[in-house]
């Protein structure tokens, strides 16, 4: 009887946990031309006591600190009856409410005008969303499921491209927990979408998608997708198979524009690739380098992952001694895959190898510091922002180059 009671108690708690109500996000764009979005989150079943909510200071795939809270304003909180709650800002990006009734609704305005893999950008043409740069979250409730609705899509003629799981309507998506939500970038725009099916070595089929927001017509995007598909096949040859992507698909979120930053950012089942070019046409070789690097990350970093990056902490920079492997080996294989796929000539590939060798052998930083030490410097150099001068010319060698140098040496051996 005691064993049966214990079993029933565990089952009850398990079912209760699995039936937790999701945290609901809504994002709207009534003032997109001025780079603003309005965000609401509804938090049901709030535990008794004070509730903290905050913006992130770190983002998956980035290793330095980023002050995402600086672009948040007009923060308000309400209880389940719609009555305002007293709001305390206890840190620059952390807020607290008390005396709630078990439900808390939070609303705020956010500004974003920078297209890359880390930040948020909004205008009449699109909303380019990195989740940690956009959405507040509840530290106490990181395991709750999440739903999100993207409003105003019809007004702007936008579609949704993301690795999030589709929900009950075209503008609604879900995530099983906070980490997957934060690791799922979103492109809202009138983009071209090209999809194809990949048959894995175990005969299972998965969908690979290319979302392209740029000035090219669909034929150009379609032709480019064939090159991307060739790269994907060559990448598969390195490991013998592709990863088993969650929800059966992988998405390249590609965004070109004259004001964009050049960037690539890996995620578990997608990647963001941005550049300040206005078109794919004529720039295919340069773009394929980023595509190859980022897709290789779907194994290396996303599934072959440094223990030092788990669990990922969104509240501060995440330091790792293994980025020479995570990023450096990816750098090496990204270029090797392009050579094997026929996108680089022997001369072009040898130029890449020469750059790797010179980047380490002639670097004062590499002469004084190990690859592990350079990896730990990422918390300062990986798109981190500072205004004072530094001595990086004499003390730093990129862990990308350092790791690629080691990978080359092992391959030659």
PLM features: residue spans?
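Active-site-proximal structural scaffolding
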Residues: 34, 68, 141, 224, ...
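Juxtacatalytic substrate-recognition/specificity segment
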Residues: 197-323
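Short glycine/serine- and small hydrophobic-enriched flexible loop segments
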Residues: 332-339, 405-413
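Non-catalytic architectural context of zinc metalloproteases
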Residues: 42, 67-74, 78-231, 238-245, ...
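Acidic/His/Gly-enriched intrinsically disordered linker/tail segments
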Residues: 305-312, 317-400
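Early extracytoplasmic/domain-onset interaction patches
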Residues: 20-58
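Carboxylate/His-rich catalytic cores and anion/metal-binding grooves
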Residues: 170-181, 232, 246-249, 253, ...
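Bacterial Sec-dependent N-terminal signal peptides
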Residues: 1-23
